[in-house]
Amino acid sequence: MENQINVGIIGAGAMGLLYAANFADKSKLTLFTHRKEQADLLNQKGISLIDNETTKNIHIHAAQITEEEQLTKQQLLIIAVKQYSLNEIIPILQKLPTKIPILFIQNGAGHLERLSELGTTRTILLGISEHGAGREDDTTVIWRGHGRTKYSIFQGELNDDLKELLTSSPAFPIEKHANYQAIIQEKLFINAVINPLTAVLGVQNGKLLENQEWHRLLIRVVNEVETVLPIENALEKVETICRTTALNFSSMALDCMNERMTEIDGIVLPILEKGDKTETSLPTLRTLYQIIKGLEGERHV
């Protein structure tokens, strides 16, 4: 395809690798990594995308995040790092030309309070990913669950080429929504229930429905979160995700198992703070938060 758009993806974890693999054929793609060794490996080997029983190798161009000249060439940047890595990424984005639109696809809502640091003249898109993915190594990603990417314009506007690029394809559906708060709140709600429960229990998502006591606990957390973050058919939506991703471990469960820092402050803390403002008690959710923060403290992550 001629005149392909320069798309940069920042972050080469599970989501970054998955999005790079899917954008590689419809854009001139650069995947920006934290470590030079990973960029070198990706340039040599490409991305191995494992989907069910098939493995596909996709050749891509990778560069280290410190290569500012490469960043300034991009016509769209997709930010695929975890919430806690934004402290490192925001200062880099601040230096870039304001004409480059930025799409955030973080879990949680912690990143929303950072957007003002990018000014008011830049086009900013807020998105969520329904895909499940797991990174096996620096160049291999397993596509654990197919879903959609939903995005909304927070500020600014997109040109026609970018609108076309962000149009749905059957293999990798993308949907534009009018209200960014609605799509982020729904994903935040689901993550705030499933992630901490599976992380504390160390189980796959489906176990929250199979085990009667854990299912009661799930219902209790749903009822608590609903008091400060109401969404339609909340329990049904949470249970549907547990069912469709039954064999998957949530990202937070995997982080705890691998003794990594979690996104608990980006996912659960905003809900607890909302509860504090309205003097609403969220005892079960707060307990889950304290357990996970305590585990992080024990591991010094």
From Swiss-Prot:
It catalyses: (R)-pantoate + NADP(+) = 2-dehydropantoate + NADPH + H(+). Belongs to the ketopantoate reductase family. One of its GO terms (biological process) is pantothenate biosynthetic process. Transmembrane segments: none annotated. Catalyzes the NADPH-dependent reduction of ketopantoate into pantoic acid. This is 2-dehydropantoate 2-reductase. GO terms for cellular component: cytoplasm. Keywords: Cytoplasm, NADP, Oxidoreductase, Pantothenate biosynthesis. The active site is at K187 (proton donor). The lineage of its organism: Bacteria, Bacillati, Bacillota, Bacilli, Bacillales. One of its GO terms (molecular function) is NADP binding. It is found in: Cytoplasm. Its main location: cytoplasm. The keyword Transport does not apply. NADP(+) binds at G11, A12, G13, A14, M15, G16, N107, A133, E263.
